[in-house]
């Protein structure tokens, strides 16, 4: 069974389709707690033509809380864009925390760099301009037990999430967390068919349906799929 025509009109970045409730959450809980430099970066990014790729402020607070609860120190980020989630992570890590951030386009990262610098956390970030898979493969070749990561956040090319997972489940320590963004894909993953999407969005939608089924059956991790932003799946490595 496909979606109804009314469902199609609801496609947007956040799966919370009540605009009033979303506005309430952001204005009551998220924006008052948003770091000054994150606010500045968000406002600049919202004017960008690819602003839909911005991690929402309420999701950013969720990521920050998780990082602090985990006492994470070493993290990986695949897909940086202007760096909202990257700056969120850097602010949440301790002073000696380290982030390996990978993206194919450094020009987007440079939009956020002044805000990262003003926040005083640039020293925590190692930005690598590259496709992620070759970097991850090299990291696996050079990895020692003490070099394992606490946490990884993926918000990149959707069709490669499964490939990233196979690497990250070895790079992140047992008990560590791997997070995948956008896994509910505007809510469209609920339907076997979803007419009206752009062809590239339909490819990503099908990729997420396959990924969600795969992660739910992967014995190496336990998962929780959270309906915040556009959907975030948290994987905790078991072995």
Swiss-Prot record:
Amino acids binding S-adenosyl-L-methionine: 55, 77, 79-80, 85, 103, 132, 157
**Which reactions does this protein catalyse?**
norbelladine + S-adenosyl-L-methionine = 4'-O-methylnorbelladine + S-adenosyl-L-homocysteine + H(+)
Which pathway features in its UniProt record? Alkaloid biosynthesis
Which GO terms fall under molecular function for this chain's record?
metal ion binding; O-methyltransferase activity; S-adenosylmethionine-dependent methyltransferase activity
Q: Which GO terms describe its biological process?
A: alkaloid metabolic process; methylation
Q: Do you know which InterPro entries this protein is assigned to?
A: Cation-dep_OMT, SAM-dependent_MTases_sf, SAM_O-MeTrfase
- Enzyme Commission number: 2.1.1.336
Q: Where are the transmembrane segments?
A: none
- Report any Pfam family annotated for this entry: Methyltransf_3
User: Which PROSITE patterns does the entry link to?
Assistant: SAM_OMT_I
Top EC category: transferase
Record-listed a divalent metal cation binding positions: 155, 181-182
Keyword terms: Alkaloid metabolism, Metal-binding, Methyltransferase, S-adenosyl-L-methionine, Transferase
Q: Which cofactor does it need?
A: Mg(2+)
Q: In which tissues is it expressed?
A: Mostly expressed in bulbs, and, to a lower extent, in stems and roots.
Q: Which domain of life does the protein's organism represent?
A: Eukaryota
Matching entries from PANTHER family are given as: O-METHYLTRANSFERASE-RELATED, TAPETUM-SPECIFIC METHYLTRANSFERASE 1
Family membership noted in the UniProt record: Belongs to the class I-like SAM-binding methyltransferase superfamily. Cation-dependent O-methyltransferase family.
Query: What is the recorded function of this protein according to its Swiss-Prot or TrEMBL entry?
Result: 4'-O-methyltransferase converting norbelladine to 4'-O-methylnorbelladine. 4'-O-methylnorbelladine is a precursor to all Amaryllidaceae alkaloids such as galanthamine, lycorine and haemanthamine, and including haemanthamine- and crinamine-type alkaloids, promising anticancer agents.
This one is known as Norbelladine 4'-O-methyltransferase
**Species assigned in the record:** Narcissus pseudonarcissus (Daffodil)
The major lineage groups are: Eukaryota, Viridiplantae, Streptophyta, Embryophyta, Tracheophyta
Annotated gene: N4OMT
